[in-house]
């Protein structure tokens, strides 16, 4: 039996607790409770198993990972194991003593999320008064510390016109990299698609803004587009079970953070099975790995080893079957569902459903 290549990255979702209430959150609709979270010893074992498996990077995420009092200890474990560590944070819980402790522990990089460039826009999306000022203060602390920093802006219908101002803020705060990431419509994003999905004109405007910023030079810019205006799908996390492994707060192991929407599937847990066994031989990770599972037209497509059939969770959400061709693809028999979603979601005003951790 030929084993798959090891994953490059581990997404360690330490907790679903978060002081923000973003309506596009990538967490599942059913949030895991604090009582179910893995303890420090178990997360340490997960990191050790990840390093042994061949993982190179660990991304500490959430929720808000800074809600975990053992974050510094886990960062130090990652350093001991020579795992590149990235903290994905809202910044609202970050202060100078905490940052100094993370720096001493060996943290390699911080991705700081912003909901908008205006206070009103940030509070409308994040739901936390004063969050924008805290984020700006956090960015200045990170810059002063010398830890490399990426600013992440999630964009959608309400803030997409402010992308140039996002770049201006990034330059002001001394970020080396900026990620302009359109909302991805899974989980909370899918629940709020009617309110958040931009028009094609807005998408094209955002692309022009990104291209103009890249032309200036001096700032590295990552750009993630929404699938709904495309005619070919993106590879799901670089291909299902090929590059990434995700561990939830309670220890469930997923090929991507949205996979739990797929029904009638057993999700293995690091408390019961080693990460190596899960990655190499579990039915879950082999379910859509490679190309043998593909239906037509994917099976005969020249792009099948580039996009790997697209997103299984999107196929599940829009067609009811995770094995179907990603409906974003213009060759998919279900492509009309994406076209209809775009048409239906162009309402001038829609209600936002906020992610609440109660």
UniProtKB/Swiss-Prot annotation:
Ranges of residues in domain Radical SAM core: 4-219
Cofactor note as given: Binds 1 [4Fe-4S] cluster. The cluster is coordinated with 3 cysteines and an exchangeable S-adenosyl-L-methionine.
Pfam families, alphabetized: Fer4_12, Radical_SAM, SPASM
GO BP annotation list: pyrroloquinoline quinone biosynthetic process
Pathway assignment: Cofactor biosynthesis; pyrroloquinoline quinone biosynthesis
Molecular functions (GO terms): 4 iron, 4 sulfur cluster binding; cyclase activity; iron ion binding; oxidoreductase activity; S-adenosyl-L-methionine binding
Iron is among the record's keywords: yes
Binding site for [4Fe-4S] cluster: 18, 22, 25
Name of the top EC class for this enzyme: oxidoreductase
Enzyme Commission number, as recorded: 1.21.98.4
Catalysed conversion reaction: [PQQ precursor protein] + S-adenosyl-L-methionine = E-Y cross-linked-[PQQ precursor protein] + 5'-deoxyadenosine + L-methionine + H(+)
Protein role: Catalyzes the cross-linking of a glutamate residue and a tyrosine residue in the PqqA protein as part of the biosynthesis of pyrroloquinoline quinone (PQQ).
Assembly notes: Interacts with PqqD. The interaction is necessary for activity of PqqE.
Family, as annotated: Belongs to the radical SAM superfamily. PqqE family.
Protein name: PqqA peptide cyclase
Source species of the chain: Gluconobacter oxydans (strain 621H) (Gluconobacter suboxydans)
């Amino acid at each position: 039996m030929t084993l798959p290549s090891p994953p490059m990255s581990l997404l360690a979702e330490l907790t679903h607790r978060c002081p923000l209430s973003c309506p596009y959150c990538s967490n599942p609709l059913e949030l895991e409770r604090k009582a179910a979270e893995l303890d420090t010893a178990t997360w340490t074992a997960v990191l050790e198993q990840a390093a042994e498996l061949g993982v190179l990077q660990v991304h500490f995420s959430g929720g808000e990972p800074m809600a975990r009092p053992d974050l510094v200890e886990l960062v130090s474990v990652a350093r001991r194991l020579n795992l590149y560590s990235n903290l994905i944070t809202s910044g609202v819980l970050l202060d100078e003593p905490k940052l100094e402790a993370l720096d001493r522990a060996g943290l390699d990089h911080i991705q700081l999320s912003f909901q908008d460039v205006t206070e009103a826009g940030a509070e409308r999306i994040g739901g936390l008064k004063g969050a924008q000022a805290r984020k700006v203060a956090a960015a200045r602390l990170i810059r002063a510390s010398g830890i490399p920093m990426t600013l992440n802006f999630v964009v959608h219908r309400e803030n997409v016109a402010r992308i140039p101002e996002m770049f201006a803020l990034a330059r002001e705060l001394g970020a080396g990299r900026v990620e302009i990431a359109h909302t991805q419509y899974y989980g909370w994003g899918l629940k709020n698609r009617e309110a958040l999905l931009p028009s094609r004109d807005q998408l094209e405007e955002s692309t022009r803004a990104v291209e103009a910023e890249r032309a200036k030079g001096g700032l590295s810019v990552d750009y993630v587009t929404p699938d709904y205006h495309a005619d070919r799908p993106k590879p799901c996390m670089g291909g299902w079970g090929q590059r990434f492994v995700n561990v939830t707060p309670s220890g469930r192991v997923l090929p991507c953070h949205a996979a739990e929407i797929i029904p009638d599937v057993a999700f293995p847990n690091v408390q019961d099975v080693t990460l190596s066994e899960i990655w190499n031989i579990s039915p879950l990770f082999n379910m859509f790995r490679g190309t043998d599972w593909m239906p037509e037209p994917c099976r005969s497509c020249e792009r099948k080893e580039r996009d790997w059939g697209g997103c299984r969770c999107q196929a599940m959400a829009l067609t009811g079957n995770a094995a179907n061709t990603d409906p974003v693809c213009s060759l998919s028999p279900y492509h009309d569902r994406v076209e209809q979603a775009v048409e239906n979601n162009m309402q001038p005003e829609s209600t936002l459903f906020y992610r609440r951790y109660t």
